[in-house]
């Protein structure tokens, strides 16, 4: 195969603060509303006006009843309409005329119309703010995730991350779109309603407010319990999503081992656990809201009883009693809304804490404050005393004392038994990991002194399992150079032996490859990956067993393409089939993380040792 061509991150910790309401994440979340401040202010103003109009409704209705039965005079809110449109004094019951009632009814209609207008403004502007904040948060979180190191994703299930991008942010959206404005509007309704109630009858108002302390205590107790259950449910749902993601991404393995029932049982168990938490949350919610409203219904019952006695004594006009009852319902609704807002803040605080855990995660590959610029890259890669181990594997060194130089344009083959450290070694080249000890340099510059994006611009990787994205063939080829012309894309495909099969598709380069490139064969995907690397034009190549899973015909086509790709580039080749590396400039033999042999194919065979053992194992049948 590889014949020489001619001339930031530690994982975030678990959710904390489940025992008390921590508003810090929610306050941080509100910072994302700044770009939409004027829309939020407009929604707040509209909501406040709407709340005042809603308070006006009981007053107008009370005036309507008082005037209809001649039990009282008109208030200032409706008096102007009666003066303007009403009838002559002395007509009707108690001096009230049908025209007076018509005038008050017009005020009632105007209140309804204005309230509808303010509701439209509030709902539309809040929808814009909520969708905008969520879109900004998703974009920021996704960009941040893409900048984290490989180690972060090796310690976090993909499903858990996806859950935080979707369900947690959906919970946040509901809070952003509702909590702040509802807090203001319900405050206006509550304070304004209580003031009007005191104006109507202070003694009756005190009776209504007598039940408030018990309601507030109940809300606090239920809210604390709801927060704990909501946090547990979100964690369990993320775990279920992680299991589903794992099974779906490995569907071929699942089906080949007929493990469908096993995976379904695992997912079902995770869903049952989440479902149990969801039922606990539903049960607490079911107790939460009725308990709060029961207190207010008791207050309304007391108002009816005591207000009826005042009306019988002539101390309270019947219209004022109706106004009082309607305002009591309004105040009760406002306090009930506060309890609902409290539970929503609980859930949003838990969801935002989980999202901000990801946003606060830092890569364990810090970028230099003043990176060294890479000008004309020659491609010399040097490993100096490199030792490396994964954090979750105890004290086992995966690489132990590696000293190796790959000269510009040289093809270096890495061979050895499974677990020898071959793949780990090449992951240090694009700086997916940093060595624990020693250093890796490019043209004499420590990789830790380079901008990672600048470094990776000069490194091309063709893995064994090629990942294509679910776009067109052309989009996948130009993935490393989005601004490449169509002619450059075709030229890269021709050099990669891909142009012929691409043109056989009805849509040519516009053919959609499907998720992960499933519509293409393994050899076709590999050649598209080679075309992608050719178009990127890197100085350094990493070929990680690039043909080990291909049939002979596909391997021959890919081999020719790889030889073109390697021309003039420093290349690291990993291969289990030793026949594919016989023409490499140097073969480096690894065993247990150490270099045990270095040389060309013929030299290593003559020398004996591990290389010849591996060679004889692979070719004993042929030699026989």
Where are each of the predicted segments found?
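A short amphipathic helical element positioned immediately N-terminal to and/or at the very start
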Residues: 22-37, 161
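Transmembrane helix-loop-helix hairpins at lipid-water interfaces of multipass membrane proteins
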Residues: 40-117, 198-203, 301, 305, ...
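Helix-loop-helix
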Residues: 196-210, 280, 284-353, 358-359
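An intracellular "coupling" helix at the cytosolic face of ABC transporter transmembrane type-1 domains
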Residues: 30, 34, 150-151, 167-176, ...
């Amino acid at each position: 195969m590889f014949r020489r061509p001619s001339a930031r991150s530690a994982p975030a910790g678990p959710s904390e603060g489940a025992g008390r309401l921590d508003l810090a994440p929610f306050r941080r979340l509100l910072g994302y509303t700044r770009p939409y401040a004027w829309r939020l202010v407009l929604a707040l103003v509209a909501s406040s006006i709407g709340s005042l109009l809603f308070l006006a409704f009981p007053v107008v209705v009370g005036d309507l009843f008082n005037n209809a039965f001649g039990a009282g005079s008109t208030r200032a809110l409706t008096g102007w309409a009666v003066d303007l449109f009403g009838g002559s004094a002395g007509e009707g019951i108690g001096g009230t005329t049908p025209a007076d009632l018509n005038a008050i009814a017009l005020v009632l209609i105007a209140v309804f119309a204005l309230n509808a207008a303010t509701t439209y403004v509030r709902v539309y502007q809040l929808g814009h703010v909520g969708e905008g904040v969520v879109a900004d948060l998703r974009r920021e979180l996704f960009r941040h995730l893409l900048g984290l190191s490989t180690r972060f994703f090796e310690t976090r299930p993909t499903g858990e991350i996806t859950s935080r991008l979707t369900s947690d942010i959906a919970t946040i959206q509901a809070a952003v779109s509702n909590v702040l404005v509802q807090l203001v509007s319900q405050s206006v309704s509550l304070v304004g309603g209580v003031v009007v109630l005191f104006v109507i009858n202070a003694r009756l108002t005190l009776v209504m407010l007598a039940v408030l302390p018990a309601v507030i205590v109940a809300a606090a107790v239920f809210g604390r319990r709801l927060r704990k259950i909501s946090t547990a449910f979100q964690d369990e749902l993320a775990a279920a999503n992680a299991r589903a993601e794992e099974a779906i991404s490995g569907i071929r393995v699942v089906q080949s081992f007929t493990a469908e029932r096993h995976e379904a049982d695992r997912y079902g168990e995770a869903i049952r656990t989440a479902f149990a938490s969801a039922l606990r949350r539903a049960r607490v919610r079911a107790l939460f809201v009725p308990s709060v409203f029961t207190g207010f219904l008791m207050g309304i019952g007391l108002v009816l009883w005591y207000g009826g006695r005042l009306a019988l004594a002539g101390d309270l006009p019947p219209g004022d009693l109706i106004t009082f009852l309607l305002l009591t319902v309004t105040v009760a609704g406002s306090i009930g809304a506060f309890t609902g807002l409290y539970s929503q803040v609980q859930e949003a605080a838990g969801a935002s804490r989980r999202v901000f855990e990801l946003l606060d995660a830092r890569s364990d590959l810090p970028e230099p404050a003043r990176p060294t610029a890479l000008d004309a890259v020659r491609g010399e890669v040097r490993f100096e005393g490199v030792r490396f181990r994964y954090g979750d594997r105890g004290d086992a060194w995966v690489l132990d004392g590696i000293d190796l130089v790959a000269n510009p344009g040289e093809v270096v083959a890495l061979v050895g038994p499974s677990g020898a450290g071959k793949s780990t070694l090449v992951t240090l080249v694009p700086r997916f990991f940093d060595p624990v000890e020693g250093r890796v340099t490019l043209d004499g510059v420590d990789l830790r002194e380079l901008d990672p994006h600048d470094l990776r611009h000069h490194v091309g990787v063709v893995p064994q399992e090629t990942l294509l994205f679910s776009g067109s063939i052309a989009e996948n080829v130009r993935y490393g150079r989005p601004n490449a012309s169509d002619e450059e894309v075709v030229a890269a495909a021709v050099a990669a032996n891909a142009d012929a099969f691409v043109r056989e598709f009805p849509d040519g380069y516009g053919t959609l490859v499907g998720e992960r490139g499933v519509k293409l064969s393994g050899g076709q995907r590999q050649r598209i990956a080679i075309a992608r690397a050719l178009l990127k034009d890197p100085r350094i190549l990493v070929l990680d067993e690039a043909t080990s899973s291909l049939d002979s015909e596909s391997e021959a086509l890919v081999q020719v393409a790889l030889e073109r790709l390697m021309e003039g580039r420093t290349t690291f080749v990993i291969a289990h089939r030793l026949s594919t590396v016989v023409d490499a400039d140097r073969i480096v033999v690894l065993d247990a993380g150490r270099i045990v042999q270095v040389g060309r194919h013929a030299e290593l065979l003559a020398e004996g040792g591990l290389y010849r053992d591996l060679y004889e194992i692979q070719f004993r049948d042929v030699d026989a």
